UniProtKB/Swiss-Prot annotation:
Pfam families: Ppnp
Name by which UniProt lists this protein: Pyrimidine/purine nucleoside phosphorylase
Organism: Leptothrix cholodnii (strain ATCC 51168 / LMG 8142 / SP-6)
Gene name of this polypeptide: ppnP
Entry keyword Glycosyltransferase: yes
Residues annotated as transmembrane: none
Length: 104
């Protein structure tokens, strides 16, 4: 899938968790910030500053929000919300998980 948009792309990758998560930051013409990335099979914990919406592009994952005891699963075309100043665990098994993260 490809989209044509007016944006500035940070061509230097953000590499986290010894390369298990790699993303690129994008700033749209209106100042909106996003990142596009991939998470390889692993269970990782992310902290958030601003609220985030994680949009699944390919692959699947299970997530557990801070304060929750239950895991929720998401696949292509599905999204989940993460509150700001919080955290979430994400579990990827099998195929890599491709995502778009919408900030704010």
């Amino acid at each position: 899938m490809t989209d044509s948009i007016a944006a500035t792309i940070n061509t230097r990758a953000n590499v986290y968790f010894d390369g298990k998560c790699v993303s690129h930051g994008i700033t749209l013409a209106d100042g909106t910030k996003k990142s596009v990335g991939v998470i390889l099979p692993a269970t990782l914990t992310f902290n958030t500053g601003a609220p985030e919406v994680m949009e699944t592009v390919a692959g699947s994952c299970s997530i557990k929000l801070a304060g929750s005891d239950s895991w929720q699963s998401y696949g292509p075309g599905e999204r989940f919300d993460v509150p700001g100043q919080s955290s979430f665990e994400i579990k990827v098994e099998g195929e890599p998980y491709h995502y778009i993260c919408h900030f704010g």
